[in-house]
A protein has these predicted regions:
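Left-handed beta-helix
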Residues: 1-90
Length: 90
């Protein structure tokens, strides 16, 4: 399910996915098996088999089998990672 007010710019979505309200995805590939919660930005990334919390930024990432919490900022190339709420990994 993809919410109506998701902004997709030059990106590919591979179902099944859940993408919540006010998400921006740019120059990225998302899916399969990805959940992205509200007010999150994903730029220049590839995300699969992962959960990304609300109010989070994912930049320049290649992630798989990962969980990123709420209010996080992630800029990196770890392939599998779990990050708690209010974390920064840049």
């Amino acid at each position: 399910m993809i919410s109506e007010n998701v902004k997709l710019i030059n990106s590919k979505i591979i179902e099944p996915v859940f993408i919540d309200d006010n998400v921006v995805i740019e120059n990225s590939t998302i899916g399969p098996h990805v959940s992205i919660y509200k007010d999150t930005k994903i730029l220049d990334s590839h995300v699969e088999n992962s959960i990304i919390g609300k109010h989070t930024q994912v930049l320049n990432a290649q992630i798989n089998n990962s969980m990123i919490g709420n209010n996080c900022k992630y800029d990196g190339n770890y392939k599998s990672i779990n990050i708690g709420d209010f974390s920064e990994l840049i």
